[in-house]
């Protein structure tokens, strides 16, 4: 008996749409990362991208527990000396709500070329509209 290995050209990828309204950020991100990797499929292979495409709507309405709305801080560096910048969860939601979900999911994916390919299949939108109707995404309840 041989071990099954998925081939990149034979992987069937579906499109799913998820509504993030009222969902807890971390719990949503873990399920998104799992589906982007393809771990929910029987033909999952660690070194092959077997995941699905996922569209996340209403990213501006994602929830966090406790005091994280004001206490959770995101850091990034501009590349210049003394260029460390910070923003709270509240500021991030006000400025770029998509980035909050993207950062959470990206940290849960593998680092390297395979992880970047998986991350490209995540489409996040702040509002209720998306431009992927041609792909006929199925509603995914998380």
UniProtKB/Swiss-Prot annotation:
SUPFAM superfamilies: Ribosomal protein L13. GO terms for biological process: cytoplasmic translation; negative regulation of translation. It comes from the Bacteria. Pfam families: Ribosomal_L13. Signal peptide: none annotated. Gene3D superfamilies: Ribosomal protein L13. GO terms for cellular component: cytoplasm; cytosol; cytosolic large ribosomal subunit; ribosome. Keywords: Ribonucleoprotein, Ribosomal protein. InterPro entries: Ribosomal_uL13, Ribosomal_uL13_bac-type, Ribosomal_uL13_CS, Ribosomal_uL13_sf. One of its GO terms (molecular function) is large ribosomal subunit rRNA binding. CDD domains: Ribosomal_L13 (cd00392). Part of the 50S ribosomal subunit. This protein is one of the early assembly proteins of the 50S ribosomal subunit, although it is not seen to bind rRNA by itself. It is important during the early stages of 50S assembly. Belongs to the universal ribosomal protein uL13 family. This is Large ribosomal subunit protein uL13. It comes from Escherichia coli (strain K12).
């Amino acid at each position: 008996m041989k071990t099954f290995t998925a081939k990149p050209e034979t992987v069937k990828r579906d499109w799913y749409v998820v509504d993030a309204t009222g969902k807890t950020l971390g719990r949503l991100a873990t399920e998104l990362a799992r589906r982007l990797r393809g771990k929910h499929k029987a033909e999952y292979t660690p070194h092959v991208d077997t995941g699905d495409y996922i569209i996340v709507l209403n990213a501006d309405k994602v929830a966090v527990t406790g005091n994280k709305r004001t206490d959770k801080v995101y850091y990034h560096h501009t590349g210049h000396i003394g260029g460390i910048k910070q923003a709270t969860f509240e500021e991030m939601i006000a400025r770029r709500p998509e980035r909050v979900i993207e950062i959470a999911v990206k940290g849960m994916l593998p680092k390297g070329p395979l992880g970047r390919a998986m991350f490209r299949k995540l489409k996040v939108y702040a509002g209720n509209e998306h431009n992927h109707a041609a792909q006929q995404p199925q509603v995914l309840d998380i």
